[in-house]
UniProtKB/Swiss-Prot annotation:
Keyword Hydrolase: no
Location of the protein in the cell: Cytoplasm
Ranges where the record places region Disordered: 527-558
Family classification: Belongs to the TCP-1 chaperonin family.
Protein name according to UniProt: Probable T-complex protein 1 subunit eta
Compositionally skewed regions (Basic residues) per UniProt: 549-558
Species the sequence originates in: Schizosaccharomyces pombe (strain 972 / ATCC 24843)
Length: 558
């Protein structure tokens, strides 16, 4: 029963909170994601453009890698940040297809925008998109070609074709033959049961040509800081015992938190003698193990360096933790945090150890490692930005080759797979009734953005080529795709434009989840940034400082 009085408004959110809801907010979220798609879509494909980005520190990055671009874009719109997440997830999961997943997600939202403007419930669109995505993934499993990797003679050739497809869209496409061989060799070096890509190290050495890059079948890392006496140490061993430590072998003055009170000069001398005895006992214990190569995360000082040099032992301190961990995994043994009770099982070994000059740097190389199969790619190039882009390109190619080995299933690239899925979903949509027919047809149209964008980026007539592709797929040519060489249409499977099927499946599922997530949001609540307390202006009045501090920490005595 109403008493007729004015209703008092209930304030739930803090004053200053930005609260936007309704169809207008949903369209705003869609438009933000479409704007991000428009930024990155020009980088798609072998003839896509590169982006030059300058961060807040003035560092320059040149790349056409989707995950790198999305990471460096300073996106502030909360909905558009979802596209950054799916690009990172695609890069972490399969390594390639990061640009495609963002472009496809943006196109799904572009198609959905028309339905939202017409007042269609977003939940109906979500249901249609999810059904279409599942149908597309099932179709990929149906049409994917199984590679016969049992023949070692054909194995390398098949993997090379997969790697070259990933390379052709990168900055190093002119040298793709050289780097493709390096990538395939690197992946085949790994344990084929595990295929752990973390066992492939990548080191960058500025200077020289790209063809000066090399593959080391073992562990390699840059020479660490060394002290006097290092020059006398041997730089080459065969079958050495290797000891890895997390121990500091250095005499240094303790400046902080140190106080010694002595009554006699002899007492001070006893302290100094004890320090020398401690470090010499550590060095003697290391020599007694029979190790010829000693590595440590912590510094190895000049005294220890000269001590080891006199006994024909190589040492390196301040070794990076990731490099030392790779050495331990490759040569065996374990990292010791003490120099006492070191046994034979704690030591590793390899066929050869060598310190070699590469460009302007010296590298420590461990080759012929028995415990774990590992390798290191040493990249050369003129500019730091170029070498960094080469590293990103090789990472993508390594992941592609890894998934081709693991799953043995490939599909044709160049938009062929997307066009076949689009035809399949378009035909399927005609067999059902109701609004779901429109949503599945919209999903089918969205898939065509990949071949269309490939044509646009290459300067081709996208309308003409897409019409030809539709005709070819209607005739049953399911591997017909964009031919970048002849500006036309070709059977991309016969042209060896191959991609692992997992790249396509993961991209479709990730893009669909991102699009449906955006469509499910009907309200955005943005809290006002908290204000930092302002310091009082001018000098404090007498006694004010004591009053401010009163009550902090322990209570003041009464």
């Amino acid at each position: 029963m109403s008493l007729g009085g004015p209703q008092i408004p209930v304030i739930v959110l803090k004053e200053g909170t930005d609260d936007s809801q309704g169809r207008g907010q949903l369209l705003s979220n869609i438009n933000a994601c479409v704007a991000v798609q428009d930024t990155i879509r020009t980088t798609l494909g072998p003839l896509g453009a590169d982006k030059l980005m300058v961060d807040d520190r003035g560092e320059v990055v040149i790349s056409n890698d989707g995950a790198t671009i999305m990471k460096l874009l300073d996106i502030v719109h909360p909905a558009a940040k979802t596209l950054v997440d799916i690009a990172r997830a695609q890069d972490a999961e399969v390594g390639d297809g990061t640009t495609s997943v963002v472009v496809f997600a943006g196109e799904l939202l572009r198609e959905a925008r028309t339905f939202v403007e017409d007042g269609v419930s977003s939940h109906l669109i979500i249901r249609g998109y999810r059904k279409a995505a599942q149908l597309a993934v099932n179709k990929i499993k149906e049409i994917a070609i199984h590679l016969d990797l049992s023949d070692e003679g054909k194995l390398r050739d098949l993997l090379t074709k997969c790697a070259s497809t990933a390379m052709n869209s990168k900055l190093i496409r002119s040298n793709s033959t050289f780097f493709t061989k390096m990538v395939v060799d690197a992946v085949l070096t790994l344990d084929q049961e595990d295929l752990n890509e973390n066992m492939i190290g990548i080191k960058k050495v500025p200077g020289g040509a790209m063809e000066d890059s090399l593959l080391v079948k073992g562990v390699a890392f840059k020479k660490t800081f060394s002290y006097a006496g290092f020059e006398q140490q041997p730089k080459f061993f065969k079958n050495p015992k290797i000891l890895c430590l997390d121990v500091e072998l250095e005499l240094k003055a303790e400046k902080d938190n140190a106080e010694v009170r002595v009554d006699k000069v002899q007492e001070y001398q006893n302290i100094v003698d004890a320090e020398w005895r401690i470090i010499f006992s550590k060095l003697e214990a290391i020599v007694a193990t029979g190790a010829k190569v000693v590595l440590s995360k912590l510094p190895i000082g000049d005294l220890a360096t000269q001590y080891f040099a006199d006994r024909d032992i190589f040492c390196a301190g301040r070794v990076a933790a990731d490099d030392l961990n790779r050495v331990v995994q490759a040569v065996g043994g374990s990292i010791q945090s003490t120099c006492s009770n070191i046994e034979e099982k704690h030591l590793g070994t390899c066929d050869t150890f060598e310190e070699r000059q590469i460009g302007g740097d010296r590298f420590n190389l461990f080759e012929g490692c028995p415990k774990a199969k590992t390798c290191t790619l040493i990249l050369r190039g003129g500019a730091d930005q170029f070498i960094a882009e080469v590293e990103r390109s090789l990472h993508d190619a390594i992941m592609i080759v890894k998934h081709a080995l693991k799953n043995n299933l490939v599909v044709a690239g160049g938009g062929a797979c997307e066009m076949e899925l689009s035809k399949y979903l378009r035909d399927y949509s005609l067999t059902i009734s109701g609004k779901q027919q429109n949503f599945i047809a919209a999903f089918a149209r969205s898939l065509e953005v990949i071949p269309r964008q490939l044509c646009d980026n290459a300067g081709f007539d996208s309308t003409n080529i897409l019409n030809k592709l539709r005709m070819q797929h209607a005739k049953g040519e399911m591997w017909a795709g964009v031919d970048m060489d002849s500006e036309g249409v070709a059977n991309n499977f016969e042209k060896f434009v191959w991609e692992p099927s997992t790249v396509k499946s993961n991209a479709i599922l990730s893009a669909t989840e991102a699009a449906t997530l955006i469509l499910s949001v009907d309200e955005t609540i943005k809290n006002e940034p908290s204000q930092q307390p302002q310091a009082p202006q001018g000098a404090l009045p007498p006694g004010a400082a004591n009053r401010i501090m009163r009550g902090r920490g322990r209570g003041m005595p009464r």
